[in-house]
Amino acid sequence: MPSVCHTSPIEKIIQQGHRIQNDSLIPSKRTKLAHTELTAHYATEDSHVEKHFLHNGSNFDGIDNVRYQNQPSPLTFITPNNTVDSSDWVPQFSSMKIDDSLEFSSEYKRLYSNYESQQRLNSSRQHLPFKNCMIRKTSCTYPPQKTLRQQRQGNRDNPTDAFQFDAEFQVLEREIQKERYEPITRRDEKWFDQDQSELQRIATDIVKCCTPPPSSASSSSTLSSSVESKLSESKFIQLMRNISSGDVTLKKNADGNSASELFSSNNGELVGNRHIFVKDEIHKDILD
Amino acid sequence: MLRYHMQGFSGYGVQYSPFFDNRLAVAAGSNFGLVGNGKLFILEIDRSGRIVEVNSFLTQDCLFDLAWNESHENQVLVAQGDGTLRLFDTTFKEFPIAIFKEHEREVFSCNWNLVNRQNFLSSSWDGSIKIWSPLRKQSLMTLTPRPLEITKMVDPLNAIILKKKSFTGISKNRNCVYQAQFSPHDQNLVLSCSGNSYASLFDIRLPSGKNQNNFLVHSGLEALTCDFNKYRPYVVATGGVDNAIRIWDIRMLNKNESATIKRTVPGQLHNSSCINEIPNAHGLAIRKVTWSPHHSNILMSASYDMTCRIWRDLSNDGAKETYKTNSTDATKGSIFNFTQHSEFVFGADWSLWGKPGYVASTAWDGNLFVWNGLG
């Protein structure tokens, strides 16, 4: 059998590791101070590496995993031994990345990363809330400054709103005026309807006409003294004075449209004659 | 003097019966006629000289005037405040025998035709005069005084003088026809007076538009009363708010110029048909004038100054014209002044019977007085 057919897999692995070393950026300078630590590290790494390789040795996919996980380590240094086989092997192992089964999953790492980002955003938001609002409009709880400014501008310039405001003000003003003057009106005035007011006006005119001014001289008056004395004692003139002052007025019928009696507006008593209803009938067969 | 008091009612009109020498009818209203019932009183003077009530009729509204039926001794017509006229029979109780309803407002006067005795008329605040027959419910004819522009017709000088006398000026009740009368000489002549200060003379034989002649009688103030002289067919008297009584000769009314102002001579009255004037006949407005049935030159007036006066028309001596006026006389021709009433006097009528000079008057004090003004 040719010798090529007798090469062991370990040798092949060693060869691949050598090539990686040449291509990587690992420094080749030796460090004396860390020798002891490096030794311990190598011992630990050796046991892990062996277990790993032995565990995945029968699977060719394991080789790809090793290649994928091979990452440079900051603690990796070149050994002082310059033996071709051992020196090449040890650094290669030290530079490999170990896939820890207890490590957090990538999904967890992603979620945690988002969480940290959120925390940073919250922290920055506390310091610059407006800036944040300007950047992320969708997350704002209130409209941006520009929008607020526009709303304020609209309130000033919108004629509909101004009109409504004025209308409301006028309504309020009327209510105040009504409340202010209504008690006085109720105290000082008696509520008369049109007919009652008309009668009061006529009575006032009659009193003025039939009563001479007190300051007028007897010679200038057109009425004789006897007529004046009669007028002063006249029951009709006295009734007119009472109607003029509002003490007496028309008493409306039940229908509210006509009046048939006079009454005192002070105490409600009847003044003058009581009205008696008369049927609108005739004696028949008289003219025939 | 005889007296009768209508308790609770004010007298508005009184008239002697044309058939019985001792019977009178009085139209009255409660509460001075302002509001409330009316009442028609049928009174008689008994042998001992007392006035007694023989019948009465209570009405739904106030009564403003009345007229005896000249062809039936027991029937009396009344003018009512609700716009109706009612015919009562004094031998019946409570209700009328006929109701005539066409006027739209208060009926202020009614008058029976003395010539044909078959018709009567009414005048109303609605501005119309209606002629009726007692046998028909509907009126025979409606007369309306032609409306005139008062401000253009009023004599400016008289208006100024009247204003100085504290008059209220132009009447506000222009359309109101306060009184209308048939002529006692011609059954076709009707005289009326209105709140627009005009008197209107109607000849009902003429077609509408040509049947009336209007003349200004009280210088723009309300004309409240008018009456035909019983002996001189062409003489009428009017009274109004200006406290004056004026006497007119309707023969001098010019049909074309009766409503215009003529001032050919300074101081002359603005209407040449006025033949006499009694200025300031009363202290207040004159509500009633009525000529004597016994003398051609004597008339009576009733006024708001609570008095009744008897006057002699000095423009006529009973036989011929004297061309004098009462304004030139010291007493203004006053014969008698009756002062017993204590309220406005609205109704007055001469007695046709007994010694000439007996009159009856009624006022808002509810009293009816029968007295003699000619001694």
From Swiss-Prot, chain A:
It comes from the Eukaryota. Keywords: Cytoplasm, Peroxisome, Protein transport, Thioester bond, Transport, Ubl conjugation. Monoubiquitinated at Cys-5; acts as a signal for PEX21 extraction and is required for proper export from peroxisomes and recycling. GO terms for cellular component: cargo receptor complex; cytoplasm; cytosol; peroxisomal membrane; peroxisome. Its main location: cytoplasm. There is a cross-link at C5 (Glycyl cysteine thioester (Cys-Gly) (interchain with G-Cter in ubiquitin)). It is found in: Cytoplasm, Cytosol; Peroxisome. Pfam families: PEX18_PEX21_C (PF25098). One of its GO terms (molecular function) is protein carrier chaperone. GO terms for biological process: protein import into peroxisome matrix. Belongs to the peroxin-21 family. Interacts with PEX7. Interacts with PEX13. Interacts with SES1. Receptor that mediates peroxisomal import of proteins containing a C-terminal PTS2-type peroxisomal targeting signal via its interaction with PEX7. Interaction with PEX7 only takes place when PEX7 is associated with cargo proteins containing a PTS2 peroxisomal targeting signal. PEX7 along with PTS2-containing cargo proteins are then translocated through the PEX13-PEX14 docking complex together with PEX21. Acts as an activator of the seryl-tRNA synthetase SES1 by increasing its binding to tRNA. This is Peroxisomal protein PEX21. It comes from Saccharomyces cerevisiae (strain ATCC 204508 / S288c). The lineage of its organism: Eukaryota, Fungi, Dikarya, Ascomycota, Saccharomycotina.
UniProtKB/Swiss-Prot annotation, chain B:
WD repeats lie at residues 58-89, 102-133, 172-203, 218-249, 281-312, 340-372. GO terms for biological process: protein import into peroxisome matrix; protein import into peroxisome matrix, docking. PROSITE patterns: WD_REPEATS_1, WD_REPEATS_2, WD_REPEATS_REGION. Coiled coil: none annotated. GO terms for molecular function: peroxisome matrix targeting signal-2 binding. Keywords: Cytoplasm, Peroxisome, Protein transport, Repeat, Transport, WD repeat. Present with 589 molecules/cell in log phase SD medium. Belongs to the WD repeat peroxin-7 family. Interacts with PEX21. Receptor required for the peroxisomal import of proteins containing a C-terminal PTS2-type peroxisomal targeting signal, such as 3-oxoacyl-CoA thiolase. Specifically binds to cargo proteins containing a PTS2 peroxisomal targeting signal in the cytosol. Cargo protein-binding triggers interaction with PEX21 and formation of a ternary complex composed of PEX21 and PEX7 along with PTS2-containing cargo proteins, which is tranlocated into peroxisomes by passing through the PEX13-PEX14 docking complex. This is Peroxisomal targeting signal 2 receptor. The lineage of its organism: Eukaryota, Fungi, Dikarya, Ascomycota, Saccharomycotina.
